[in-house]
């Protein structure tokens, strides 16, 4: 390994601790923080705690061209394919069979456990098949294929629920099939079950480039956002609510401020325009000044609940408000369709299970003379590339980006120069350059010391890398390998 004179140690040393020491001086922290991870009294570690305030994220382009466009409702497609796994946790269990008639809101999948979610038909029609399918991320699940009748008849069972206390609210949330629709897909009733919450955080940051679905939700459905917040605060006995909105949405900030002005315990907090402002731990710190510990009381990774907070996406809480009013569960999704290859960029509301290709067609198709180079589901920072347009829109999908072949060309990576920019960009205060090195040598102990399990896969490190290396992808692989080794029980 190459060496150099390190003024922080007063001797020749390898570049590895020297880079760590340089960053320690630059951020105002001691070098030792970067060379060990010592548990602290709060259940976290010195690495996470010391770096928390130096975490900065990345200044990514906003590209919110569709923010001013009203949502368009898509015509009912001829077919939908609805997977039983559209959430974190156990897949739902199909409760329909081939030939069954379904309506909008008919249950087709029952939650497979506490950490799971019910799934409902988004269309009226006939079940064509219940069969295995490969998801866009490569995993396998069971899916229900439905041929639509074009009527969109609503199931008579869809009636507004009666909510009088927390248990009945939890039942309503479960019956809604509600999950985090901002991207994670975590079942909402699991979050709200905690009894140690004093602050409800509404995540309206929408910090990903291109995506404007939450912006349109705030401008078009502010009444159901407020009713959803009121229900959660009342029945979960949460005294305080903060709605966090990035400052690049002034209309949304003004509108929500006017609506909550006379609501007790509710405030709107403008957030810095810095990606990833919507990340859970970043949002908790920015809005409340609290820390989410690395390790919670149970010994598992810390959650916002360990800091007295529960986070709901703004569209999720609005969906709850709509369900309490109408009894219609989560069956449709607003999607931002953008990119230089799509003919008519817009926000479009589609039935869950609609194939990407049908969404693309509803937005005018691919521009004439443009060769499609890449389809991204989600945003450009945390989304994934789809191998084709033959995949369905899920509950948590909020973007479909279409880029030309020219725009989709990846830059040629060069050798890492250990500049430390990935360290500066990481919102979790990690050292991606060291994690990558440890992963390449399959060094479990170093990955543990470098807290690889804190990585949120935000992509800031890759964005900041001047060598154009796939740092975030390697971080994700490193985290998966580390957690896999941890599950083996031998470490």
Q: What are these model-predicted stretches?
A:
Residues 3-24, 33, 94-100, 410-430, ...:
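Cysteine-centered iron-sulfur cluster-binding motifs in ferredoxin-type domains/subunits
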Residues 43-95, 145:
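N-terminal, Lys/Arg-enriched amphipathic/low-complexity engagement segments
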Residues 97-110, 129, 424:
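Short, well-structured beta-strand-loop connectors
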Residues 125-127:
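Conserved hydrophobic positions within beta-strands
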Residues 129, 134-195, 250:
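Acidic low-complexity segments
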Residues 180, 200-214, 341:
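Gly-rich Lys/Arg/Thr-decorated short loops/hinges at beta-loop-alpha junctions or inter-strand turns
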Residues 239-356, 363-369:
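Hydrophobic alpha-helical positions that pack around
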Residues 397-413, 423, 427-463, 467-491:
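Ferredoxin-type iron-sulfur electron-transfer modules in oxidoreductases and energy-metabolism complexes
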